[in-house]
Amino acid sequence: MKTLTILRHAKSGWDVQVERDFDRPINKRGARGAELIGQWLKRQKLPVDRIIASPAVRVTETLDIFQPAADLGTLEPHWDRRIYLASSATLIDVIRDTGKNAEHLLISGHNPGLEDLILMLVPESADD
């Protein structure tokens, strides 16, 4: 069975002056959160074999902390600019395009696209 893990970037700081939103970094709270989530994934014993991610600074910084904590070794993310500010439909396209050969695909990006993707993939109730 194929597995999809959806990881939003860690908490970012609005107090840092950057010219573009794309360049906004994570903050200290975000760094702690990225490490904790990585440790959680490691405990689940679900080996990730493919990562696709937005190349935005806050995503790259999140993965720099998350990956060692999750013990993902030298797995290199596939950076896909389409993920930045993507709709759920675009995210589905990215997953189809780059996740075909993965058994456990991790996608890392941004809201509202990731949240909309989850709402599209998960039924409203267990009865559905």
Could you say what each language-model-derived stretch is?
Residues K2-T3, L7-R82, S125-D127:
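Active-site-proximal alpha-helix that buttresses catalytic centers in soluble enzyme cores
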Residues S12, L85, L114:
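Active-site micro-motifs of SAM-dependent methyltransferase domains
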Residues E19, I92-V94, S108:
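Surface-exposed beta-strand edges and their flanking turn/coil or helix-capping segments
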Residues T60, R96-D128:
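Active-site-adjacent alpha-helix immediately C-terminal to a catalytic or transition-state-stabilizing loop
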Residues T62-F66, L91, L117-I118:
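Hydrophobic packing residues within well-ordered alpha-helices of enzyme cores
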Residues I83-K100:
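Short phosphate-binding loop-to-helix
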